Amino acid sequence: MICWPYPLLMNAFNNVNMAASCIITSVEFARELGIPEDKWIYPLGGAGMREKDNFWERTNFYSSEALEKSLDSALDVSGLKTEDIDLFDLYSCFPIVPKMAAHHLKIPFLDPPKPITLLGGLTSFGGAGNNYSLHAITEMTRQLRSKRTQANNHKDGRAFNGLILANGGVLTYQHVICLSTQPRSDGKTYQDGNPCPNVVQSVPGDFSDIVGSEGVGTGVWEGIIETYTVQFSRTNEPGIGFIVGRLKQTGQRFVANVGDEKTLRSLVKETGEEVIGKCGWVWKEENGTRNLFGFEKKANL
């Protein structure tokens, strides 16, 4: 286990296959170069957006506005709908990402009718630093070419479309591109500029302040867990817990470390109970700047 709930298998590996390339050119120049038309794959449209860099400024921790708007905008500017896509590659920067994307696109995640990964994502192909999604573009190109060849053999002239979702950070960066075996039927070209704003603009309705390094002040405050993780040691033991939550009295969001062993064990499911939404207590560490959290008042780690 690295950080709960992600074991080593679900974490990114930097040094995997680093080499990939693609050639992007115009129809005129492709003809001038003598590239056979059965090799051509058309980029129809794309979009990209990122969440706020400070994770504690996000609206919630169970969805991604950047992911959803990037997917919707890329499909829209490409003149496509989800049902028009034949192949997906939804990169799993963490396992939650393709689940969230599939949920937003209304694709069954456990038994999808169409492939939602071509290379296997993080588990089978590595992760951060290896430029995964350029590999996805090259693999999508190969598979779309193959589908076109098979269709031509059966006198089927329809277009085949693919969608690639690239992402990185902590659900931070999202980029989507749609590729096709045919140019757009409406004659439109790839759009000028990004249809999305660069950064998510919305903030939580009740988000006015965060309890930061100044701590929660004196006293003990009741708080609700919004999200959490636990960092494990080299000996695979829970080491330090991290909590993001809300103070019940003021609605302020707080960030805290876990203040006692019992709470720490509760976070890693030794009790079998999910703790998101559960109430506990927050206080400022004595002679320190950290907030501490525990299910019992002012417990000690």
Language-model features: locations:
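Conserved catalytic cysteine-centered active-site region
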Residues: 1-3, 9-10, 48-51, 61-66, ...
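Flexible glycine-rich surface loops and low-complexity tracts that mediate binding to linear polymers
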Residues: 270-288
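Short glycine/threonine-rich loop-to-helix capping motif typified by GTGT followed
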Residues: 58, 92-109, 127-132, 170-182, ...
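Condensing-enzyme catalytic core mediating Claisen C-C bond formation in acyl metabolism
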Residues: 2-64, 138-139, 154-158, 164-259
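Phosphate/pyrophosphate-binding loops at sites that engage ATP/ADP/AMP, CoA/4′-phosphopantetheine
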Residues: 71-84, 108, 212-219, 263-264, ...
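Extended, hydrophobic alpha-helical segments in both membrane/secreted and soluble proteins
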Residues: 66-75, 84-101, 137
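Active-site-proximal alpha-helical scaffold in enzymes
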Residues: 22-28, 77-80, 128-151
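OB-fold/S1-family single-stranded nucleic acid-binding modules
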Residues: 285-301
